[in-house]
Amino acid sequence: MSRKPKILYVVQNLSGGVLTYLTSLCNALKGSYDIVIGYAKDKDSPADVESMFDPSIPMYSMTTFDREGNLLKESAARRELRDIVEKEHPDIIHMHGYKAGMIGRKALDGMGIPMFYTPHGYLYLSETHNLLSRSLYRSNEANLARCDCMTIACSKGEFAETLGFTRNATYVNNGIDVQSIQKVIDAHEPREHPFTVYTVGRINEQKNPVLFNEIARVMNDVHFVWLGDGSWRERLTAPNIEVTGWLSREDSLHRCLDCDVFILTSLWEGLPISLLESMYLRKLCIVNNVVGSRDVITNGENGYVVDSAAAFVNAIHHHKDPQSARMIEAAFRDINEHYTVDAMAREYSQIYQEALAEETA
């Protein structure tokens, strides 16, 4: 029997939507590929993160992987990553996130192994960073795009940004495991609850808890829930906001089912898993007008795309309109047609196989 090709996934932050994305992708690909994961663990990562993956998958916690740009640690991280490559001999390397892409391409360019990079949201798109920082992030992306590495964007919007750096690029929409979600839906016993607006994810700069808090303060008679935790938790000061802390994926889905309207206030995105899941759960989805979110939601067709706290509030007030019910069903259909993990895995596998064929040609 021939050996299965081996993929090394390098991940800068194994938590939130990226964690859900990667566990689903690994489960879908493990029959055709051997998989190895090198990852950074931060305060937002679940303590038992390795137990969320199939036990056949070797996991390397990269202790030198520093998100804050420490040059000494960056050099050590490159050495640590090269050590993993020398030990595991992967046939394919796929890096996820800005820091993973930067360290991986610097460390491994020229080794003759097919490499891929998925940004999951370009940092330079965030308007909360000053102009100098955004310029530096963009410059780094442009310089590293010269490496022998294909960028696989996770949405059409991210792909359009990528083409500003390189033509060695394609895109694969993120997808969700609808079968596992359906099992939760089928087992769910609805609970009585007040009208509830919710979001899911890390409470950090990217997810924009300041805007979420502003919306909650305006709608002070509505219950708001943030499913998750993070370093910006103290920004959620409105008394009508409940912060759940980190929950298991199944418990989080059950809580989502007992909520009514999903909002995503993010400042930038790749293609948000929490949005895809809420669309499948048949929740009205209202998103900030940013790359990634607006690639999935078309305003007035399968949800609302808005630009301000006032516009979020106005859209929430329309949740009982007949038009909103039609949009909810349109969003559900979109998931089944375009955003399943099976479709995502097929497209990734095709890209990987084409790269392997070129190596052996």
Regions found by a protein language model. Name each.
Residues 95-101, 119:
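Short His-centered aromatic/hydrophobic patch
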Residues 9-22, 26-73, 161-163, 230-232:
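N-terminal strand-loop element at the rim of the active site
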Residues 8-10, 190-207, 213-217, 225:
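Conserved donor-binding/catalytic core segment of Leloir-type glycosyltransferases
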Residues 75-79, 114, 124-143:
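Nucleotide-sugar donor phosphate/pyrophosphate-binding loop at the beta->alpha transition
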